[in-house]
From Swiss-Prot:
This is Interferon-induced GTP-binding protein Mx2. Residues 209-212 are annotated as: G4 motif. One of its GO terms (biological process) is synaptic vesicle budding from presynaptic endocytic zone membrane. Induction: By interferons. Residues 140-143 are annotated as: G3 motif. GO terms for cellular component: cytoplasm; microtubule; nucleus; plasma membrane; presynapse. Residues 241-244 are annotated as: G5 motif. InterPro entries: Dynamin (IPR022812), Dynamin_GTPase (IPR001401), Dynamin_GTPase_CS (IPR019762), Dynamin_N (IPR045063), Dynamin_stalk (IPR000375), G_DYNAMIN_dom (IPR030381), GED (IPR003130), GED_dom (IPR020850). Residues 39-46 are annotated as: G1 motif.
Length: 625
């Protein structure tokens, strides 16, 4: 059964669906299933496409394909029928004579990429409906060049490679690589580029051209390539013979070319087996490509619909951020500004309570705050550990330096005070450092909310950020003052008697436990741990008091410092920002200035509306399919 009989009913709808989505512009938002044709210069790429489409394409030296060309071929049931249509940018024109196609493409390229030799990534769409073409759509890409010629830019090679990679990198693209038989396939730039983006050759298909130019003795190498024995490609290879330069000069018809191609392979002693195995000729290539494209489309469609839904949701969310634009009526403008500022304030307040922030999904400041508060606890623990290690040494040094007329064994409260105050003082600057870090964090988060709530309104954004910055400075100064006052109070040395007694008792119990373990005794030793009559015993007693009190201080500061910082820098800053932003609404003189919109925003909003429209249409197409 022939291809047209077996697949006609499902082939064309599949290809038409993707062509329709591409015509809608969906490819601006998402990659669509496609066959991209690439090849080095003089690889025979244009000849292959001419043989498939039945129309002459631009030829010449240098890069002749200067824009991606979407070649849509539609098989007509009418005998000897031909019709063409070219579309690019906002231009569309019917083509009645196939002889006009080449000139029409050149004209389109000149209008898009200029009259020189530059290239562009803007798509030209050529539709050919004929009884002599397969149902197939391919995208022809500029040939790969290494050296600039004539008016080409010096970096034309890099430009062409970037454009090609833009297409062939997409997982939805089948890469059709055209390679001449008379070159070493392993050195061709086109195949190298294809395998860079598709290392396993899963979506790469090779076409070998110019078999009539193969050197004698090299034929079996070509056969090995086609049989996938040299450079493996999952989709395999096929070999074709198209019109040569002399045949083009002699104006040999494409129908005659197909006949000559068939005769060439049937009569060739080496390539005949390839023809018998349907691995040769343009008709077999057309059939293979159509089947590959239809299968590829069928495999991509379920995921495509899902991706369109996701993109549509993202587009709607972005449109919500930009809003519907500024109203023109004065009263409506006031309401508009009020709504924007209210939404911003609500986001700020929600941020301070850990609730959902509307303008920025998943934004939550508390994990970062907890990290900072954990660092503060680490500061406390670090100073405490250092204190415990050097406490006895410090007491001995202090006693030697400051002991007066008193006999050994008399415990001075002043010694206790001086040592404790010295340790507490070491905690003050780490607390201020945490304040600065958290202050910067809160400013960043508030500023992000301002950016997400006021896109396109630079004056409101600037005003909000100025207020955030000013409030940060004021509240940071106030909070620093409170913290320093807290540390001044800590210098008074105070806790409830019972608190100190209980803590001391617990600490002594732990120390005695350690002593028992050290002595290897199950019960308490006969002498008390601190019942010494010499200065060492006194120092041990004082050590226990110092450790006990310092642990009380660190427990107090572990909570107090974060509570002060969180209340002043987060809660109070948010409340002050709320008051000052509301004041903006009440000052009617600045409303016009505040509502001046960024000139790019209207354009972005229009682009988003266009995207939303084409994606919605795309879903309708998919639903009907």
């Amino acid at each position: 059964m022939s291809l047209s009989e077996q697949y006609e009913e499902k082939v064309r709808p599949c290809i038409d669906l993707i062509d329709s989505l591409r015509a809608l512009g969906v490819e601006k938002d998402l990659a669509l299933p496609a066959i991209a044709v690439i090849g080095d210069q003089s690889s025979g790429k244009s000849s292959v496409l001419e043989a498939l489409s039945g129309v002459a394409l631009p030829r010449g030296s240098g890069i002749v394909t200067r824009c991606p060309l979407e070649l849509k071929m539609k098989k007509s049931r009418k005998a000897d029928f031909w019709h063409g249509k070219i579309k690019y940018e906002d231009y569309e024109e019917e083509i009645e004579d196939p002889a006009d196609v080449e000139q029409m493409i050149r004209k389109a390229q000149n209008e898009i990429a200029g009259t020189g030799m530059g290239i562009s990534d803007k798509l030209i769409s050529l539709e050919v409906t004929s009884s002599n073409v397969p149902d197939l759509t391919v995208i022809d890409l500029p040939g790969i060049t290494r050296v600039a010629v004539k008016d080409q830019p010096e970096n034309i090679g890099d430009q062409s490679k970037r454009l090609i990679k833009k297409f062939i990198t997409k997982q939805e693209t089948i890469n059709l690589v055209v390679v001449p038989c008379n070159v070493d396939i392993a050195t061709t730039e086109a195949l190298k580029m294809a395998l860079e983006v598709d290392p396993n050759g899963e979506r790469t298909f090779g076409v070998l051209t110019k078999p009539d130019l193969v050197d004698k003795g090299s034929e079996e190498t070509v056969v090995s390539i086609i049989n996938n024995e040299i450079v493996y490609l999952n989709k395999g290879y096929i070999i074709v013979r198209c019109r040569g330069q002399q045949e083009i000069k002699d104006r040999v018809s494409l129908n005659e070319t197909v006949k000559r191609e068939r005769d060439f392979f049937e009569d060739h002693p080496h390539f005949r087996t390839l023809y018998d195995n349907r691995k040769a000729t343009i008709p077999n290539l057309a059939e293979k490509l159509t089947l590959e494209l239809v299968f590829h489309i069928g495999r991509c469609l379920p995921r495509l619909e899902e991706r369109i839904q996701v993109k549509l949701s993202e587009t709607q969310a972005e449109l919500d951020r930009y809003g519907s634009g500024t109203p023109t009526e004065p009263e409506q403008r006031i309401y508009f500004l009020t709504d924007k500022i209210t939404a911003f304030i609500q986001d700020v307040l929600n941020l301070t309570t850990g609730e959902e922030v509307k303008s920025m999904l998943y934004m939550n400041i508390f994990p970062d705050l907890r990290k900072q508060f954990d660092l503060w606890k680490n500061d406390l623990d670090s100073v405490g550990e250092t204190f415990n290690k050097k406490i006895e040494k410090e007491m001995k040094a202090y006693e030697e330096k400051y002991r007066g007329r008193e006999l050994p064994g008399f415990l001075k409260y002043n010694t206790f005070e001086v040592i404790v105050k010295g340790q507490i003082k070491q905690l003050e600057e780490p607390a201020i450092r945490r304040l600065k870090e958290i202050s910067d964090l809160i400013k960043r988060e508030f500023s992000q909310l301002a950016h997400s709530n006021f896109p396109g309104f630079p004056n409101i954004l600037k005003m909000a950020k100025t207020k955030i910055d000013n409030i940060k400075q004021v509240k940071e100064s106030e909070t620093e003052s409170i913290l320093r006052t807290q540390f001044k109070m800590e210098m008074m040395i105070y806790t409830q008697d019972k608190t100190h007694h209980d803590n001391l008792k617990m600490l002594k119990s732990k120390e005695e436990g350690k002593e028992r373990q050290k002595l290897g005794v199950a019960h308490s030793p006969s002498h008390k741990l601190y019942d010494h009559s010499d200065s060492e015993g006194i120092r041990e007693e004082l050590t226990c008091h110092l450790k006990s009190y310092f642990s009380i201080v660190t427990k107090r500061l572990a909570d107090q410092v974060p509570m002060v910082i969180r209340y002043m820098m987060l809660q109070e800053s948010a409340a002050q920002l709320q008051r000052e932003m509301i004041q903006l609404i009440q000052d009617r003189h600045n409303i016009e200035e505040l509502l001046k919109e960024d000139h790019d925003i209207a354009s972005k909003r229009n682009n988003l509306h266009s995207c939303q429209k084409r994606l919605t249409e795309a879903l309708k197409y998919l639903a009907k399919f």
